[in-house]
């Protein structure tokens, strides 16, 4: 049989043209449907959002004040019956959640508990200046008791003075450290306040590095029990110098000399809590006439870490009140709060991508792709009471237009305890999707019809 090349080419081109027109109609139809679907999805999302806003507003209007709401969340009927401290907090150091609070947001003087901030800033400074020394100024040498007894003109290594600061609570050492790092007490106070803001403290104002009662144009030297617990959490859990901080504050005895080796000094740790309970981790005492007795301390047991902060916990002769309150709160936490595994790696619904291009299915204008939770663990351990439950809320977009990148944000998975958000993960796309174009579609169609197999079939059977 005689072959007719021109006939073959003509027929193939005709088939391509018909197929292309058919696919174009199919694409236009699907595109219109996807556009309507996307518009409906967007509208539904807006309605849902407005509804959520109205509900949130109702809840806000129904709350008389933040303090009352905070207290209401934490009433279980078995809280510590009586505390001597006027302000107190029990915090989960892992999450930063306040497990119990008594006037936790009332602003009060903090006395020498201030020195945990002075210490952690000094340790972070020493990371770059490990052998920094300081010449004692007249201001440092004239600080009232409790003091090391340094003299003007003496030179000390800052790292040695941190033991004087934290074990004996020496006021002159605090001023010397501040001047050695920032040049003056005033400049160091700025660094203290900046760090407090960075940590998330909302009601803390530092004026002195040693915690002596003071007042300036910004207010009095003060904090809250919750803010003080946040600062301790930073010192033992978050700071890059947390291990060194624990090493310093747990040291029982320390001896050092001035840089010229003319005098020798000995320091003894006065934090009685370290020997009071198994797992006692760190802490700092404080007292001034305005502040009363204060304390902030931490305990770690069975992988749980608790922080207690106490302000205005008695005045002379009630020095032991702070230890009773600390023990009572720590025992309360140990008895009632335990880690529970909460499933986190929840896979949300798939995401519809319109204007999508799949080389394997060129006539398809949309496709569904999987979503995943970014950097998610299999499960998350959260410190909870037996009766507490975690509520999960998934918010994802229903539709996106191509192109879509792999790992592109598509929503969030939030975890709530009562009405408080305690964790949030980002939901991202599982893979990339190309944008559909006419050129890409026609290229695929042409390639399919111009294969050698199709030509052979046509010649053989037509």
PLM region spans:
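Gram-positive cell-envelope targeting signals
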Residues: 1-46, 51, 446-462
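Structural motif marking the loop-to-transmembrane transition
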Residues: 5-9, 158, 438
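Intrinsically disordered, low-complexity segments enriched in small/polar residues
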Residues: 18-20, 43, 50, 60, ...
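Compositionally biased non-globular segments, especially hydrophobic aliphatic-rich helices
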Residues: 22, 27, 41-47, 59, ...
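Domain-terminus/edge residues, biased toward the C-terminal soluble/receptor-binding domains
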Residues: 27, 219-462
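Active-site-adjacent loops and short helices of periplasmic peptidoglycan-processing enzymes
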Residues: 31-240
């Amino acid at each position: 049989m005689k072959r007719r090349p021109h006939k073959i080419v003509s027929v193939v081109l005709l088939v391509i043209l018909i197929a292309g027109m058919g696919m174009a109609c199919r694409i236009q139809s699907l595109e219109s449907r996807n556009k309507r679907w996307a518009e409906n999805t967007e509208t539904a999302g807006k309605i849902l959002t407005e509804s959520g806003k109205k509900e949130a507003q109702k809840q806000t209007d129904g709350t008389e004040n933040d303090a009352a709401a905070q207290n209401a969340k934490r009433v279980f009927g078995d809280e510590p019956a009586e505390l001597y401290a006027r302000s107190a907090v029990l915090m989960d150091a892992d999450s930063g959640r306040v497990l119990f609070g008594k006037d936790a947001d009332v602003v009060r003087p903090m006395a020498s508990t201030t020195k945990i901030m002075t210490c952690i800033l000094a340790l972070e400074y020493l990371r770059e200046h490990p052998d920094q020394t300081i010449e004692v100024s007249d201001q440092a040498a004239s600080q009232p008791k409790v003091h090391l007894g340094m003299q003007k003109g003496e030179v000390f290594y800052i790292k040695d003075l941190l033991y004087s600061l934290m074990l004996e609570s020496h006021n002159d050492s605090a001023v010397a450290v501040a001047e050695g790092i920032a040049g003056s007490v005033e400049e160091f106070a700025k660094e203290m306040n900046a760090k407090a803001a960075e940590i998330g403290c909302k009601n803390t104002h530092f004026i002195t590095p040693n915690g002596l009662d003071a007042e300036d144009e910004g207010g009095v030297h003060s904090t809250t029990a919750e803010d003080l617990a946040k600062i301790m959490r930073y010192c033992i859990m978050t700071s890059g110098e947390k291990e060194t901080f624990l090493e310093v504050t747990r040291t029982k005895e320390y001896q050092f000399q001035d840089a010229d080796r003319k005098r020798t000094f000995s320091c003894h740790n006065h934090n009685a809590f370290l020997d009071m309970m198994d797992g006692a981790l760190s802490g700092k005492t404080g007292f001034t006439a305005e502040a009363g007795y204060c304390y902030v301390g931490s305990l770690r047991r069975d992988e749980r870490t608790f922080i207690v902060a106490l302000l205005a916990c008695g005045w002379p002769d009630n020095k032991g009140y702070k230890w009773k309150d600390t023990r009572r709160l720590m025992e309360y936490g140990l008895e009632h709060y335990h880690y529970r595994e909460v499933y986190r790696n929840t896979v949300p619904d798939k995401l519809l991508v319109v204007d999508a291009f799949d080389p394997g299915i060129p006539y398809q204008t949309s496709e569904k792709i999987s979503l995943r939770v970014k950097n998610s663990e299999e499960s998350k351990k959260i410190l909870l009471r037996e009766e507490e439950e975690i509520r999960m809320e998934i918010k994802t977009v229903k539709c996106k237009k191509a192109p879509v990148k792999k790992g592109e944000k598509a929503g969030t998975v939030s975890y709530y305890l009562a009405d408080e958000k305690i964790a949030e993960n980002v939901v991202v796309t599982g893979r990339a999707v190309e944008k559909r174009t006419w050129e890409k579609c026609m290229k695929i169609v042409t390639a399919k019809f111009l294969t050698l197999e199709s030509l052979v079939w046509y010649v053989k059977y037509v």
